[in-house]
Amino acid sequence: KAVAMYQKALEQKIDNNEKRAGVIKQLSDCYLAKEDYSNAIKYYQDYLTTLGNASANDAAALAQIYIQYADTLSDTARIDMFKKAEQVYVDMEKKYPDALEYVTFMRARVNSYMDPETKEGLAKPYYEKVMGMIEPRAEKSASDNARLVECYRYLGYYYLLKEDKATSTSYWNKILAIDPENEIAKQALTLTTK
């Protein structure tokens, strides 16, 4: 019902691009709520084009739709959708340099989704880059620490799989320095001492 209403609204002459973009976004949101990802993506792309001056948050939302869609797919189609999400982040890196840390972090996540068993280490360079951005800060926010824990967890697991126990151990210990009660790090350390 809402989809028909918004489509009818789009047929009307809307003299303001911002208002038109708002209607298009509502239409995309309706399709997203119905899990009709193809149409949600199509209309969201139309929204970004109509808006013209999209923010980093607007662009990132498109990547999130691709990620949600990928979660409903399998095999090659799933990977292809994750690659589309990553391409949004690549484009954001150029267009929104102030969002570099966020974009790099999200590229790490998307690459970890494409390599869930960490066999290829696709996310490794991105997590390392995020680490390099955050670690030098004298004051770290809760968000900074959460990102570091995710980086360290990925890298700790990566090196555990590579049987580099010393490097793996160093990452698990870094997690415990931030979160002394972290159960995953505690359990992983028992594996690195065997």
List the predicted regions and their residue ranges.
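Structural motif corresponding to the intra-repeat A-B loop/turn of tetratricopeptide repeats
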Residues: 34, 69, 79, 114-117, ...
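Structural register within alpha-helical repeat arrays
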Residues: 27, 47, 62-69, 107-110, ...
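Flexible helix-coil transition and linker loops at the boundaries of alpha-helical arrays
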Residues: 10-20, 48-56, 89-98, 133-146
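TPR alpha-solenoid repeat register
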Residues: 19, 23, 57-58, 99-103, ...
